């Protein structure tokens, strides 16, 4: 599957042209996209400026000598390539399994062409089997946890090595085990209006193109 993920990442990189501002995604498939951009910068003289979606991707891009700018310094991104944890037929998705959902959404929002690279296991009829990440400020997070629990959202604080996971922005993540999300837009609206929630992993209708790596090769889905 890694070879197919690599092929998907390399294929996505073909949408990147000279002079573009490029959003550099985070995750196992987006990794190969960033590697291919680095190769083209070195071997082909590709001239681009990258905007990263996590500290991990920043380190990777710097190691490849890809010129970078902060999201604060740009108004429009030409193309962003990132991964996703689930994608439904309406191009709604769940992201944030790697904990970078806030930065990923900040980069995705001003992007003209937003592309996801995924393996075929990420294609689902209904979102929700993958736990929905909700990034929350630390202050009041226990109360927010109880609110989610009272709604039957089966929350859990994300942990790493026995301690609470802390995002690149210094927040906690509460994962919601919803099993099935019948109305992603309604849930997104609810979370958007919940005090203490910084961001959530529902990316509804944002993506333009999904490059799928499967056992039979690549499939490119478009709106």
Curated annotation (Swiss-Prot):
Keyword entries, A-Z: Isomerase
Enzyme Commission identifier(s): 5.3.1.6
Pathway membership, UniProt: Carbohydrate degradation; pentose phosphate pathway; D-ribose 5-phosphate from D-ribulose 5-phosphate (non-oxidative stage): step 1/1
Name of this protein: Ribose-5-phosphate isomerase A
Catalytic activity entry: aldehydo-D-ribose 5-phosphate = D-ribulose 5-phosphate
HAMAP family: Rib_5P_isom_A
Binding site for substrate: 26-29, 82-85, 95-98, 122
Presence of the UniProt keyword Nucleotide-binding in the record: no
Residues the record marks as active site: 104 (proton acceptor)
Protein family (similarity comment): Belongs to the ribose 5-phosphate isomerase family.
Pfam families registered for this protein in UniProt: Rib_5-P_isom_A
Quaternary structure, from the entry: Homodimer.
Organism: Streptococcus agalactiae serotype Ia (strain ATCC 27591 / A909 / CDC SS700)
Cysteine-cysteine disulfides: none
GO biological process: pentose-phosphate shunt, non-oxidative branch
């Amino acid at each position: 599957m890694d070879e197919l993920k690599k092929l998907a990442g390399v294929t996505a990189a073909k949408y990147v042209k000279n002079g573009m501002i490029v959003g550099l995604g985070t995750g196992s498939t987006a990794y190969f996209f960033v590697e291919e951009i680095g190769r083209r910068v070195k071997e082909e003289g590709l001239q681009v400026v990258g905007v990263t979606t996590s500290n991990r991707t920043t380190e990777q891009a710097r190691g490849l000598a890809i010129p970078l700018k902060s999201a604060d310094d740009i108004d429009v991104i030409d193309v962003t390539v990132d991964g996703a944890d689930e994608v439904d037929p309406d191009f709604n998705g769940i992201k944030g399994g790697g904990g970078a959902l806030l930065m990923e959404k900040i980069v995705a929002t001003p992007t003209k062409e937003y592309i996801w690279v995924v393996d075929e296991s990420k294609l689902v009829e209904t979102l929700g089997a993958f736990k929905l990440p909700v990034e929350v400020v630390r202050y009041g997070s226990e109360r927010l946890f109880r609110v989610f629990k009272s709604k039957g959202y089966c929350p859990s604080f994300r942990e790493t090595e026995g301690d609470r996971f802390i995002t690149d922005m210094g927040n906690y993540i509460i994962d919601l085990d919803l099993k099935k999300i019948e109305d992603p837009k309604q849930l997104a609206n609810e979370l958007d209006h919940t005090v203490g929630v910084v961001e959530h992993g529902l990316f509804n209708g944002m993506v333009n193109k999904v490059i799928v790596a499967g056992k039979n090769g690549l499939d490119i889905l478009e709106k």
